[in-house]
Amino acid sequence: MLEKLIERVLFATRWLLAPLCIAMSLVLVVLGYVFMKELWHMLSHLDTISETDLVLSALGLVDLLFMAGLVLMVLLASYESFVSKLDKVDASEITWLKHTDFNALKLKVSLSIVAISAIFLLKRYMSLEDVLSSIPKDTPLSHNPIFWQVVIHLVFVCSALLAAVTNNIAFSQNNKGH
C-alpha cells in the first residue's frame, strides 16, 4: 500500500515539468521577437548595408532559427517523453516526435549546438580583420579569443561525434541481443 502511494506520487511529479515547458515556450516568443527585430533592421538598411554586413545579418538570423528549432525540439520531446502524450487533431503534424527517443534527441541537440557554434565562428571569420587588429602582435595564442572559440567548437564537434559513435555502438549491440 505504501509502495503504491509512493509510486503514484513519484509518477505524478512529472507534471512539475509542465510549467517549465510552458516557460520554455516563452523563450520561443523572445527568440521570435529578436528574429523579427533583426530582420526588420536588415530590411530597413537594405540599400546601405555592405555585403559583409548582409551576410553577417543573414547568419545571425540562421543562428536564431537554429536556436528556436533546438528549443522547440527539446520542449516537445521533453513534454512527450516525461509529462504526457501530445493529443492533436492531425497525427502527421509531428511524426518525428514518435521516433525520437532520448538518444536521438541527444544527437539532435549535439548537432544543433555544433551548427550554432559553426555559425558563430563563421560570423567571427567574416569580421576577422577587426578582431585581429584589436589583438597586439606579440599576444600569446592562449590570449587570442578566436583560438579559444575554435577550441570550444572542436570540443562540441568531438562531443557530438563521440555521442553518435556511442549511440551507434549501443544501438548495434541492442539489435544483436534481440
From Swiss-Prot:
* Chief localization: membrane
Query: Which spans are transmembrane here?
Result: 15-35, 54-74, 102-122, 145-165
Q: Which domain of life is it from?
A: Bacteria
Q: Which UniProt keywords apply?
A: Cell membrane, Membrane, Transmembrane, Transmembrane helix
Tell whether Transferase is among the UniProt keywords.
Answer: no
> What protein am I looking at?
UPF0114 protein HPSH_00970
Q: Which family does it belong to?
A: Belongs to the UPF0114 family.
What species is this protein from? Helicobacter pylori (strain Shi470)
Q: How does it sit in the membrane?
A: Multi-pass membrane protein
Q: Is the keyword Transcription assigned to this protein? A: no
Compartments where found: Cell membrane
A single GO CC term for this protein reads: plasma membrane
Q: Which Pfam families match?
A: UPF0114 (PF03350)
* InterPro entries (UniProt xref): UPF0114, UPF0114_bac
